[in-house]
Amino acid sequence: YPAYVLFPQCSESGYWAYAERPSVFQSKKMLADFPISPIFAVLKELLDSYLALPQVDKSRIYIIGLSMGAMGVYDLTVRYPEIFAAAIPICGIVNPKRLKAAKDVKFRIFHGSEDNIVPPSGSRRAYKALKKAGAEVQYIEFPGVGHTSWHQAFNVPDFMKWLFFQKKE
């Protein structure tokens, strides 16, 4: 699959979607309205510089993240739904009240049923909220798998095929 890939890594002292690490990972207790974090503001500038390149297909912009990165996936798709054709949050969490804004982004959500760091109930609620908003969304839960469900997610046979099939309408 030919593509331009941005693969940012958050610093040890930073946190993607929030100015600081949330004190609790319960979807209903996650913030619903907050300013963009400084680290995400810089990342958005970098993304915009790539989007300005004529060779980048603006109808095929995808975002994938795991754990804290999945929280970032939710945050950026809510803030900038016009950019993304598809999103894959893996073992993430979000306040479901935020997701209506991302209804035009196609989602494939992954989580392990035994995740004791970020509870799968957050992904289940995100799935239900996106479905209710009219989004095209799939939820795949891996039975018996803990927080490292990205191993199983990346090994789903049609992972890349599904992603690269998505196009912004």
Describe the role of every protein-language-model region.
Residues 106-169:
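C-terminal catalytic histidine-bearing segment of alpha/beta-hydrolase fold enzymes
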Residues 8-9, 64, 90-91, 142-143:
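Alpha/beta-hydrolase-fold catalytic nucleophile elbow
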Residues 39-46, 69-72, 76, 80, ...:
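Stable alpha-helical elements in mature extracytoplasmic
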Residues 1-3, 102-107:
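Short, proline-enriched alpha-helix->beta-strand connector loops that line the catalytic pocket
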Residues 48-103:
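Primarily recognizes the serine-hydrolase "nucleophile elbow" in alpha/beta-hydrolase
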Residues 1-40:
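Active-site machinery of serine-nucleophile hydrolases
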Residues 11, 67, 113:
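Residue-level signal for short, function-critical loop segments
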Residues 16-21, 75-76, 99-102, 119-123, ...:
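Short, solvent-exposed loop/turn and secondary-structure capping segments
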